[in-house]
Swiss-Prot record:
Binding site for NAD(+): 209-211, 243, 272-277, 295, 330, 351-353, 399
Matches recorded under NCBIfam families: ahcY, PRK05476.2-3
Protein's recorded name: Adenosylhomocysteinase
Subcellular location: Cytoplasm
Organism: Streptomyces coelicolor (strain ATCC BAA-471 / A3(2) / M145)
Gene3D superfamilies documented for this protein: Adenosylhomocysteinase-like (3.40.50.1480), NAD(P)-binding Rossmann-like Domain (3.40.50.720)
Gene assigned in the entry: ahcY
Amino acid sequence: MTTVDNRQDFKVADLSLAAFGRKEITLAEHEMPGLMAIRKEYAEAQPLAGARVTGSLHMTVQTAVLIETLVALGAEVRWASCNIFSTQDHAAAAIAVGPNGTPDNPQGVPVFAWKGETLEEYWWCTEQALTWPNTPTGGPNMILDDGGDATLLVHKGVEYEKDGKVPSVDTAESDEHRVILELLTRTVGESPQKWTQLASEIRGVTEETTTGVHRLYEMHRDGTLLFPAINVNDAVTKSKFDNKYGCRHSLIDGINRATDVLIGGKTAVVCGYGDVGKGCAESLRGQGARVIITEIDPICALQAAMDGFQVTTLDEVVDKADIFVTTTGNKDIIMAKDMAKMKHQAIVGNIGHFDNEIDMAGLAQTPGIVKDEVKPQVHTWTYPDGKVLIVLSEGRLLNLGNATGHPSFVMSNSFADQTLAQIELFTKPDEYPTDVYVLPKHLDEKVARLHLDSLGVKLTTLRPEQADYIGVKVEGPYKADHYRY
């Protein structure tokens, strides 16, 4: 049962969870030194004063620390989760209530998120986060996105308003596409210039993840990008830490909580060997699994082979492996015909952003197959011959659906990147014409520096003659933008 109060601008599962959420937020703050240092550094300057930030990002305890950092820097914030299963309800309740409110008198941030949303509820929540009552355009002037759904809704709204019509729902390519078309049909009917007006004041978007960044580059290539974007995902302190070390932690956490199956001795297939795949493969090997990689990219395949992994095609191992994890950000990685060949009680899960890496629609259409819920976000699919597959989080992010996502320390890196990127776009609009940018190198290094003390790291300082010799400043940046780390 979700809590919605017509006097309050939020919708969460249960406000009575706020005290529990606040305790976990306090614990997380200690593990998020980057965000806390940024709060302290910018508290007086208030660089986000006047910013209206719409956030579409997993509503977790760690995200709560990000939200309260944005507020501490002067921003107003409205928030929705970017996944139907990823919200931690106690964190959402704590944000809605706020540090100075009570469940009877909430004084926090408008948040629209609960674990287990339907697709209709999910997109309604995104719409609410983008709708700012009593403002000039009725919308935000900044977006903080993860996966690009908030950005997508604005762009599709503007596109269809320009065309004068929304495509028929009969043209929808999926259930989610149908829901988006229904939402935009309603909003365009109610207010024919809603999205065009809303988009006019947006100074920019900062995008968290690979999938959303891919969308941004596509829109820029096609000439349809409406406002500048910072690609936070490809900041070194995001992709080389969150994607690798975060997944190394949270993949195993999700599988363990979901199944309680011993991983040691099992054969696990990791589809993709990018930063996420590398972290997943390392964690599975650390548990004693025999890990096999599938890859399309010869460079990543060579890396996997040099790291000691067998690299082959899914067809070669689909009937032999015990665990399958997709990490690619692409679609149709494991199809229904592949799952039909898997072993009894094979475990299938995804840690890429969307739910289209695993062909869940095709699986559901298999003649005679029966779906049964073991517990939330864990389902068995039983074939007519009695074979059972265990599918995690219905093909969505298993580390957030079956567990609580990445740990606080690694998210402090990513969310410090996000905060600094928001400050960049909001305070320097003249320096960022419409394009897709990466986080400036000096800010990337700053985020890393903010996390060293808590790990007991002591940096060596360049002498001036050494700095001159390699052509850098004593205080950095130390690497060229093309350096790969």
